[in-house]
Structures are given as C-alpha cells and as structure tokens.
C-alpha cells in the first residue's frame, strides 16, 4: 500500500515510517524543505499549498503534524502555534486527498485525549463529551479540519493518543531526566489518572487503523490507566531509582507554564473502540510498559 505520512520526522512518525516499510508498504513523506529523494513531496501547509498530483496512487494517509504541546512554555504565541501547526496541515492534506481520483481509502488523523479535558474519576470512552480546556478546543478544531476528506467519502479515523511512553516524549521527556537524578516523584498530589501507551503499541495501533475498517474517534491508550503516583512508582522500579519526592504544582508551572495544568489533569480513558476492533496490546499493564521504557531509554 502506498501511504503518505505527514510528521514523518517526529518521534511517532519516524517509528511509524520504519514499521510501515518493514511491513512492505511504500511510504511518501510530506516535507517543507527541498525533497532529498523520490519518496518525499514538498508542501507549504501555512499557504495551503500541496499539489494533489504529486500524491497520485496514494491509497492511505497518516497525519501526525503538530508542534509538541510540552516542547515549550505555554506563552500565548506558542499556544497559537500549537493550534495552527495542527489545523493548517490537516486542512491542506484533507483538501488534497479529496481532489484525488481515485481517492485514498483511509486517512488516519492525529488527535489526542486532551479533547476530554480534566474529568476527575470519570471513566472516559470515545462516546464521552469533550471538555472545555485549551487543549480540548485545539483537538476539536484539529479534527474538524479533516472534514474535507470525510465529506469526500474517505474513511477517517481520529487517533486520540494518550500519554506516549517513550524517551523524549511529552511529559515523559520531562519526567525521565528527573527520575535518573533520583528526583522523580508524583506530580502534584499524584492522584490524577494518566492514560498511557507505549510507543511500540502506539505505532502498532496506527498501523491497525490503516489496515482495518475502523473510523471516527479511536482512543489510543493502554487498557489499564493508572494514577500518576502508581505510574511513577512503576517507573522507579523499572529504572531502579527512588520516587519519593513529589513535584509541587508551583514548581511544574515554573518550568512548563500552562502545560502544567494538562500534566496534572485527570483523564481515565479506556480504548474501547480499539479493543473491540481486535487490537492486541504488547504492554497491557504499567509495570510491563515501564520495563519496556527502561530498556528503550
């Protein structure tokens, strides 16, 4: 299958590209610089420029574009970038796919469980209502930007990804250096639910969405969400480091700004649609996930 991938140079995109090639798929990358090979196509999503003709023969697309929500302090300017870096590429790609004849069979569209906002003890699934936080609004706009592909009859699966357990990824990119120094501990009071997924399972789930008939929102999280304190203890056991020192809310805000509110948000998400579609996790519990992360780090 010929698959176009946006965001192929990011953490998840790189791993996905490698997995697709291993499975015998042909991968075309969308890049914003001069292409360095025949497997790359240049585009300019900020100006809505993408030659649909360059995508001739594409049967599927995966869109993972977007600035990392935890990469910088949440200034108003960076919040605008977080939104624009998602909606502009998504709309540009969706419109180009809709113009193709024949049209691709599927678009796997990046999304996030941030759509649910801060929900305390509530158990969340794909049928749960959205929240009212900044990230919830971003995700809703992000998913809406893919509508041209949906309206053209392209099966569209929204991969609502949870907290990806991988070296350098999001919240874990902040947590692991502290853990190695023996300074890792629960964030805030540690009672917030964290819906995690390992990078290995994240990539497998994305491939699964390409190769099955699932559409609509799909939560990409492990089957057993845990409280932050429990996850932190599991990491401590896997890395052989103490996890006794809690990280206060004020300290988090000093380092990451408004992103601290997202780190401390409680989201108890279950991957209902993913499991019903027959997906099998390599890492079903947090201890197995933590051991995998320690080996990968």
Regions found by a protein language model. Name each.
Residues 3-23:
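N-terminal Rossmann NAD(P)H-binding glycine-rich loop of SDR-like oxidoreductase domains
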Residues 35, 39-89:
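NAD(P)H-binding glycine-rich loop region in Rossmannoid oxidoreductase-like domains
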Residues 81, 91-133:
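Conserved Rossmann-fold NAD(P)-dependent oxidoreductase catalytic core, especially the SDR/UDP-sugar
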Residues 111, 144-167:
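Conserved beta-loop-beta element that borders a ligand/cofactor-binding pocket
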Residues 140, 152-154, 165-174, 208-218:
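Glycine/proline-rich active-site loop of Rossmann-fold NAD(P)-dependent oxidoreductases
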Residues 176-184, 192-226:
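Alpha-helical substrate-binding/gating segment
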Residues 211-258, 291-297:
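Mid/C-terminal beta-alpha module of Rossmann-like enzyme folds, strongest
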Residues 261-297:
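C-terminal amphipathic/interface module of NAD(P)-dependent oxidoreductases
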